[in-house]
Amino acid sequence: MTTVEVPHGSRSVILTVSAVVEETADTRSIVFAVPDELRDKFAYRPGQFLTLRIPSDRTGSVARCYSLASSPFTDDAPKVTVKRTSDGYGSNWLCDNIATGQTLEVLPPAGVFTPKSLDHDFLLFGAGSGITPVISILKSALTQGGGKVVLVYANRDEKSVIFAEELRALAEKYPTRLTVVHWLESVQGLPTADQLAAIAAPYESYEAFMCGPGPFMDTVHQALNTVGMPRARVHAEVFNSLSGDPFADQAPVEVSDEDAADAATVEVELDGEVHKLSWPRKQTLVDIMLAKGIDVPYSCQEGECGSCACTVLEGKVEMENCDVLDPEDIEAGYILGCQARPVTDHLKIEF
């Protein structure tokens, strides 16, 4: 049995695996037992993810992000779902080795792929394991909202459909609110933008969320653009491989008297509270908020996960790495707090 007893950093915790579910031949769901004293720390929103520290003989460990397939409104415990990939060390290790009773080091929930309100009509797209955060949103919207939900779910073949029985049961439970459209490559081939546009056309007024391989999401973007859905209502989840160690505590950036004198000022709104801060130009937004003891959302601190995404309302920043953001996101004012440094003297930012 693999066990972990001591956290690697101050933010992570050790959780026990309470169940492992074989969803398909190459997919496992991992359910975690969260002690009462950690309930608040591991409260999450539909569509978020957990970062797991996975043992490795080569490097000691690797960090991987996996979406929560559970809903905070319908499931008693958080559950991530992992699909084996041919070249994925983390997914292969988990599918081959993880078992009930083992422990893993885990960072608290993070991510911005989550609806601001569940009381909308939703058009959801998932491909393969991209269904994982999507089904969390789907279940949450059905139980907490009053709108309709349409899911377009693409897979290689019928055997590779994750959560097939759960989706069937939900469709029976909510016959007037939930529509599930399955797309099987073995039967229909890969979906084209025109084909997806034809499916999406009646739902142009809905909120769209998508997750899946890059080519699939590119096709969905084209389809939604064709039907005229505003970019502000289109949300995509993108995962990049983590190059750094999000579990390690970061050393504070030293600020000289000269740097402090030249600092910008920023008003940051987080969870309805406004913080007025001095922002030295060598420090990132996450740096200064952590230094002030503010519980800012973040994970990798490498600009690779999007956990710290926020919006600039006034002012301008520069970012070293922002590949996880689409050009449309940047144009809309989205930034990454772990990469953002001030350019202008005064800024307003909202999480």
Swiss-Prot record:
How is the activity affected by temperature?
Optimum temperature is 33 degrees Celsius.
User: What positions does the entry give for [2Fe-2S] cluster binding?
Assistant: 300, 305, 308, 338
Per the database record, which ranges form the FAD-binding FR-type domain? 10-116
Q: In which pathway does it act?
A: Steroid metabolism; cholesterol degradation
Domain named 2Fe-2S ferredoxin-type is located at 264-351
Signal peptide extent: none
Q: Which cofactors does this gene product need?
A: FAD; [2Fe-2S] cluster
UniProt note on regulation of activity: KSH activity is completely inhibited by zinc ions. KshB is specifically inhibited by Cu(2+) ions.
Describe how the cofactor binds: Binds 1 FAD per subunit. Binds 1 2Fe-2S cluster.
> What Enzyme Commission number(s) appear in the record?
1.14.15.30
Checking Pfam families in the record gives:
FAD_binding_6 (PF00970), Fer2 (PF00111), NAD_binding_1 (PF00175)
Which SUPFAM superfamilies does UniProt cross-reference here?
Answer: 2Fe-2S ferredoxin-like, Ferredoxin reductase-like, C-terminal NADP-linked domain, Riboflavin synthase domain-like
Keywords for this protein = 2Fe-2S, Cholesterol metabolism, FAD, Flavoprotein, Iron, Iron-sulfur, Lipid degradation, Lipid metabolism, Metal-binding, Oxidoreductase, Steroid metabolism, Sterol metabolism
Q: Which domain of life is it from?
A: Bacteria
Query: Which PROSITE patterns does this chain map to?
Result: 2FE2S_FER_1, 2FE2S_FER_2, FAD_FR
Keyword presence, Iron-sulfur: yes
- Which GO molecular-function terms appear in the entry? 2 iron, 2 sulfur cluster binding; 3-ketosteroid 9-alpha-monooxygenase activity; FAD binding; metal ion binding
List the catalysed reactions. androsta-1,4-diene-3,17-dione + 2 reduced [2Fe-2S]-[ferredoxin] + O2 + 2 H(+) = 9alpha-hydroxyandrosta-1,4-diene-3,17-dione + 2 oxidized [2Fe-2S]-[ferredoxin] + H2O
Subunit notes for this chain? The two-component system 3-ketosteroid-9-alpha-monooxygenase is composed of an oxygenase component KshA and a reductase component KshB.
Please describe what this protein does.
Probably involved in the degradation of cholesterol. In vitro, catalyzes the introduction of a 9alpha-hydroxyl moiety into the ring B of 3-ketosteroid substrates such as 1,4-androstadiene-3,17-dione (ADD), 4-androstene-3,17-dione (AD), 4-androstene-17beta-ol-3-one (testosterone), 4-pregnene-3,20-dione (progesterone), 19-nor-4-androstene-3,17-dione (nordion), 1-(5alpha)-androstene-3,17-dione, 5alpha-androstane-3,17-dione and 5beta-androstane-3,17-dione. KSH has the highest activity with 3-keto-Delta4 steroid substrates.
Q: What is this protein called?
A: 3-ketosteroid-9-alpha-monooxygenase, ferredoxin reductase component
**What is the originating organism of this protein?**
Rhodococcus rhodochrous
- Supply the source organism's classification: Bacteria, Bacillati, Actinomycetota, Actinomycetes, Mycobacteriales
